[in-house]
Amino acid sequence: MSDAAVDTSSEITTKDLKEKKEVVEEAENGRDAPANGNAENEENGEQEADNEVDEEEEEGGEEEEEEEEGDGEEEDGDEDEEAESATGKRAAEDDEDDDVDTKKQKTDEDD
């Protein structure tokens, strides 16, 4: 009988840990936890749809930001140009970071 009691308590602990993990992940992703705190009770279709939306946001998030900033400026549908400009901006930011690192290295070598 004591084995059954141990199994029950370990299942509750595992379930609690899963719920906490899901709540933390949802908080990191900017989504609220379900009202009952039980993410497992959501319908599978809703969970799959949420996952698909998250993947799309991760892949094309920066393009969407560019489109929002440029509302009305370019409506001819040249998304390639917007993607290239976004990539160029990222490359420029990376170059700035490299310059700062280089300056720090030179200072360290002089000391």
UniProtKB/Swiss-Prot annotation:
The modification Phosphothreonine is found at T8, T13, T14, T102, T107. Residues 13-31, 101-111 have a biased composition (Basic and acidic residues). The keyword Transmembrane helix does not apply. Covalently linked to a small RNA of about 20 nucleotides. InterPro entries: Pro/parathymosin. Residues 40-84 have a biased composition (Acidic residues). Residues 1-111 are annotated as: Disordered. The modification N6-acetyllysine is found at K15, K103. It comes from the Eukaryota. It is found in: Nucleus. One of its GO terms (molecular function) is DNA-binding transcription factor binding. Keywords: Acetylation, Isopeptide bond, Nucleus, Phosphoprotein, Ubl conjugation. The keyword Magnesium does not apply. The modification Phosphoserine is found at S2, S9, S10. There is a cross-link at K103 (Glycyl lysine isopeptide (Lys-Gly) (interchain with G-Cter in SUMO2)). The modification N-acetylmethionine is found at M1. GO terms for biological process: chromatin organization; DNA-templated transcription; negative regulation of apoptotic process; positive regulation of transcription by RNA polymerase II. The modification N-acetylserine is found at S2. GO terms for cellular component: cytosol; nucleoplasm; nucleus. The modification N6-succinyllysine is found at K15. Belongs to the pro/parathymosin family. Interacts with NUPR1; regulates apoptotic process. Prothymosin alpha may mediate immune function by conferring resistance to certain opportunistic infections. This is Prothymosin alpha.
